[in-house]
């Protein structure tokens, strides 16, 4: 799954040494941060889309109440998952952003 691969990459960078030959380059940190921010934007868009679908479905009159309930449950579960994924991603991105900032400062000082 693309999300787990991205999260694995982000977490690997956080666990990598901060200096020395095995430390990731600033370019690598920034490129991976960009990938993470792109995923965060996609998750935000998905959340908006799901919330809109939930609102439209809840406002709909008529139809099969059982089917509407199942669809609402499905959409709500997907929204909750997107919320959780986004929260976790934001935490990891924040930590990696701080790491990149420190690497940038170290590069400027050198």
Place the predicted regions along the sequence by residue.
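Amphipathic alpha-helical coiled-coil segments
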Residues: 29, 36, 40-43, 50, ...
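Short, charge-rich amphipathic alpha-helices with coiled-coil/heptad character
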Residues: 7-32
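Long amphipathic alpha-helical coiled-coil segments
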Residues: 86-110
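Short E/K-rich amphipathic alpha-helical oligomerization segments
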Residues: 15-16, 20-23, 45-74
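Short charge-dense sequence patches
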Residues: 1-6, 24-26, 34-45
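Actinobacteria-biased recognition of intrinsically disordered, low-complexity terminal regions
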Residues: 1-15, 104-110
